[in-house]
């Protein structure tokens, strides 16, 4: 299908830029988002995060705490204005920018994950003082996972201690990026007043008398900056030539490389994820944003150049030689002339509009009143309203087009990760994947009359947030909520009170342990036989089990031969195998990373049914867990501590007492930066302890890293606290 742009859309396919803004907490993402809206003319007054007035921080909790909690989508426009003597790839062309501002706190990493899944590019923001921080590394991995091209913005170059070269070195060494500057700050701290445009070898100078940063001039480089600019240009050419054959040929032959050629090569390398352009400035001081927007247009992909959207059939093609099911895939081309296909990437309950389903349209056009088909539920639903989103402000539109990010009102059965299409489209887009929860706690309403109200509210919140889970403890009857950290659950409880008018008591936070296996078992049987007159129950499943690779969950291969288990019962077998993973045999925690082959079984012509085979599969899994060396896993956190050098010894000693493995230590000026891997179980109360040890001068951040086996000497007390070994 050709890439066709409808005449009704606001901008053609080639003039769309869908990108997100991501960083470590306090990197300045929302401040940058606010400036983008200001300089593109979407807003006419800048709101500051510390005043609770930023456009994209619209939740009460965001305004009170000064942090971003939920991703916010906005749509605006940008036109590259010509500058004398400067090359810009798309002068005087109007571009539509769909921008998502994402949270920086690790507890809300799901918002970053689902945003990067549907975006074509990203600006990754770095603090000019702190450089690469733990959540920056997580964001970088997420962008790499979804093959998202990115531009780096080194922010806060006005702050004391800001060092552009240090951050550049961090990006190259800690993130492994092939990166080079395209816009270098002129000055730093109080003297920050412009940028070197490396490609054009010009100076962008901001007017001293314009605090809003709207007035600047493009000038010849002053003599004292010419050598620095020339060295940066040579480094830029060299690094792009390393990954771009067209530029490499010119570079090696020492042919002249003009600005249009170099920009086109940078664009090609950036879109191919082989090169990362870096810009520096200060969002808070309104310096460097217009040139950054030009870079977004110049170097991030259009809809026609973005990574291809691949859909996978929901109907199996049969088994491969290893017993795994295979499915047909095909590529979707962005076009307004094709049947629509969209991905639901977020749900949100708006108190005025109702339930919103946020979508990214990959191809086709969806109109208000259309019926969309969901391959997961195999149900059709009517599109009641279509909304263009500007943070928390919604505007009704009649249609959304290929590449648009919008919201649908009226869908009752859609959830995060669902594909929405027309007709019987039995293909699905890849859904975003989310990390496991690491912390849980009991919650109960203050009054028994609010129990049902609380349950409904928690279910609604869990539908919105895939990293928030709710379950009932079968032994105690308590409601258990689980999430990514204490702040995450604190916000949930606060939303219960504010939005749903439910006051709740909470228990002490608990670690969300996991279980896995360390050995293999070749043949383990699970059997259900109830035959005492009348129609009975008969299911017989035999499996082989072995440890899987970390992070793979459960992999099932069907190696049944000769019809030992009829095909009509295999879905029930799969359901039982998956259900058994919810509770291991060490302490009843969920099980991870197991490979299972279904190798044999038997059935009864009369007494066999789906439930019998599901139960037999569960029994087989439980029996196999016990034989395969089950162990307990605990969440390990990546922790970074920034402390005055004189407190380094005390901080190190305290980390060692917390079973930490210190991975790296570096000194920057009078500060020491410690990077360590620490069990989450040892980090409760750390905020208070680190303040005491450093007289309030040290700070830390942490994020989930991985799961590791609990030391044998600690397993017994964890099992005891859980209430004994699993039955």
Stretches with model-predicted labels:
Residues 1-727:
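Structural and coupling elements of P-loop NTPases
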């Amino acid at each position: 299908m050709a890439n066709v742009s409808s005449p009704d859309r606001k901008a053609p396919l080639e003039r769309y830029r869908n990108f997100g803004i991501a960083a470590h907490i306090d990197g300045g993402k929302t401040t940058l988002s606010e400036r983008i809206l200001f300089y593109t003319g979407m807003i006419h007054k800048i709101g500051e995060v510390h005043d609770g007035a930023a456009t994209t921080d619209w939740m009460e909790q965001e305004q009170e705490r000064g942090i971003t909690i939920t991703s916010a989508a906005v749509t605006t426009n940008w036109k590259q204005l010509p500058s004398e003597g400067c090359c810009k790839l798309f002068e005087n062309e109007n571009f539509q920018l769909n921008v998502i501002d994402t949270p920086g706190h690790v507890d809300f990493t799901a918002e970053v994950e689902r945003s990067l899944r549907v975006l074509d590019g990203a600006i990754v923001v770095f603090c000019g003082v702190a450089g690469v921080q733990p959540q920056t590394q997580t964001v970088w991995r997420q962008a790499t996972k979804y093959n998202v091209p990115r531009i780096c913005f080194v922010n806060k170059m006005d702050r004391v201690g800001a060092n552009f070269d240090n951050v550049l070195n961090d990006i190259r060494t800690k993130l492994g990026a092939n990166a080079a500057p395209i816009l270098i700050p002129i000055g730093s701290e109080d003297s920050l007043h412009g940028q070197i445009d490396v490609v054009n070898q010009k100076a962008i100078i901001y007017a001293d008398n314009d605090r809003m940063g709207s007035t600047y001039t493009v000038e010849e480089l002053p003599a004292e900056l010419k050598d620095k600019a020339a060295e940066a240009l040579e480094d830029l050419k060299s690094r792009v030539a390393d990954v771009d054959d067209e530029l490499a040929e010119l570079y090696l032959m020492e042919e002249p490389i003009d600005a249009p050629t170099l920009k086109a090569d940078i664009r090609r390398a950036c879109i191919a994820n082989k090169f990362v352009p870096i810009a520096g400035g200060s969002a808070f001081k309104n310096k460097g944003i217009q040139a950054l927007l030009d870079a977004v247009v110049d170097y991030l992909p259009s809809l026609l150049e973005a990574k291809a959207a691949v859909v996978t059939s929901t109907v199996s093609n049969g088994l491969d030689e290893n017993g795994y099911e295979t499915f047909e895939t095909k590529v979707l081309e962005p076009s307004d002339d094709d049947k629509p296909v969209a991905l639901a990437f977020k749900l949100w309950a708006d108190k005025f509009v109702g339930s919103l389903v946020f979508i990214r349209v990959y191809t086709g056009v969806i109109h208000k009143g259309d019926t969309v088909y969901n391959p997961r539920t195999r149900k059709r639903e009517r599109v009641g309203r279509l909304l263009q989103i500007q943070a928390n402000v919604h505007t009704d539109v009649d249609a959304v087009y290929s590449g648009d990010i919008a919201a649908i009102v009226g869908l009752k059965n859609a959830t995060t990760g669902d594909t929405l299409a027309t007709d019987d489209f039995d293909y699905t887009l890849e859904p975003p994947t989310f990390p496991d929860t690491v912390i849980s706690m009991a919650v109960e309403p203050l009054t028994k009359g609010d129990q049902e109200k609380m349950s409904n509210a928690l279910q609604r919140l869990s539908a919105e947030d895939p990293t928030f889970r709710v379950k009932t403890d079968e032994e105690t009857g308590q409601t258990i909520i689980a999430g990514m950290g204490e702040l995450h659950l604190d916000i949930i409880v606060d939303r219960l009170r504010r939005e749903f008018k439910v006051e709740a008591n909470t228990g002490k936070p608990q670690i969300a342990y996991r279980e896995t296996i360390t050995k293999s078992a070749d043949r383990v049987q699970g059997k259900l036989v109830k035959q005492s007159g009348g129609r009975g129950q008969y299911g017989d499943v035999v499996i082989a089990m072995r440890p899987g690779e970390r992070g793979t969950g459960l992999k099932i291969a069907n190696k049944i031969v000769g019809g030992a288990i009829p095909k009509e019962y295999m879905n029930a077998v799969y359901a039982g195998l998956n259900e058994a993973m919810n509770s291991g045999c060490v302490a009843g925690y969920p099980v991870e990373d197991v490979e299972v082959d279904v190798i044999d079984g038997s059935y009864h012509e009369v007494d066999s049914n789906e439930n019998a085979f599901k139960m037999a599969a569960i029994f087989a899994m439980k029996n196999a867990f016990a034989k395969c060396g089950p162990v307990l896993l605990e969440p390990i956190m990546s922790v970074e501590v920034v402390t005055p050098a004189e407190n380094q010894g005390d901080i190190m000693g305290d980390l060692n007492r917390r079973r930490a493995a210190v991975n790296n230590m570096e000194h920057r000026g009078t500060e020491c930066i410690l990077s360590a891997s620490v069990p989450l179980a040892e980090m409760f109360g750390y905020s208070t302890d680190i303040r005491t040890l450093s007289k309030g001068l040290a700070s830390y951040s942490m994020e989930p890293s991985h799961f590791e086996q609990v030391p044998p000497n600690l397993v017994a007390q964890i099992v005891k606290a859980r209430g004994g070994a699993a039955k």
